[in-house]
Design a protein with these regions (language model features):
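Catalytic cores of peptidoglycan-degrading enzymes
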Residues: 38-184, 191-198
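Non-catalytic extracellular/periplasmic "stalk"
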Residues: 1-45, 49
Length: 198
């Protein structure tokens, strides 16, 4: 016959197991929120992709280190994941730029923006409006230039965005995004094509 003490012990062990499982699931959820998988511009068409292309300004072959999303000036730009704003400044190449550190050597970069709604040091959440589409810096038309860097090396942002879509399609998938989606691959060329925007 099971004693009350044994029942209490079993209940306590079950409680510990549940606490550990809940903690792990919560940790995985947080990690997913910190991986830049959300579209930075809603319903935007894709212009230039990541990879080698003919630079629209110089006419020479060059590596395009991100994705371009042509859009009307003033279109909202959202953070692709939560993190801390580490750069908010003007650069001759990128124009007005915002960079968000997501931890784990992951940074997302938003360039050529017009109005900026965050400042360096701000803690931001996934989907938060951080800027507006513009045409600043070395640009041939209004668009967002979006980059994802791993350990300072540009990677194809499309892999991250695809991982986000796959995650939405399979909500019970608890696997690590980086491990299953090839997110930390090399920055070799892809099928980039010449486009109007930089």
């Amino acid at each position: 016959q099971v004693t009350l003490r044994e029942l209490d012990s079993n209940a306590s062990q079950s409680s510990v197991v549940m606490t550990v499982l809940e903690s792990r699931l919560f940790e995985q959820k947080i990690k997913k929120m910190m991986v830049p998988t959300q579209m930075p511009v809603a319903n935007a068409n894709l212009g230039s992709v990541f990879g080698w292309r003919i630079d629209p300004i110089t006419g020479a072959s060059a590596l395009h280190t991100g994705l371009d999303f042509p859009a009307t000036p003033g279109t909202p730009i959202s953070a692709a994941a939560g993190g801390v704003v580490v750069t908010q400044e003007y650069q001759s190449e990128y124009g007005n730029i915002v960079e968000v550190d997501h931890g784990n050597d992951l940074i997302s970069r938003y360039a050529h923006v017009s109005k900026v709604h965050v400042k360096k040091g701000d803690l931001i959440k996934r989907g938060q409006k951080i800027a507006e589409v513009g045409n600043t810096g070395r640009s041939t038309g209004p668009h967002l230039h979006f980059e994802v860097l791993v350990q300072g090396v540009p990677q194809d942002p499309q892999k991250f965005l695809n991982a986000g879509r796959n995650l939405l399609a399979t909500p019970n998938n608890r696997t690590n995004l980086a491990a299953t989606s090839g997110l930390y691959g090399s920055n070799g060329g892809s099928n980039g094509t010449p486009q109007a925007q930089r």
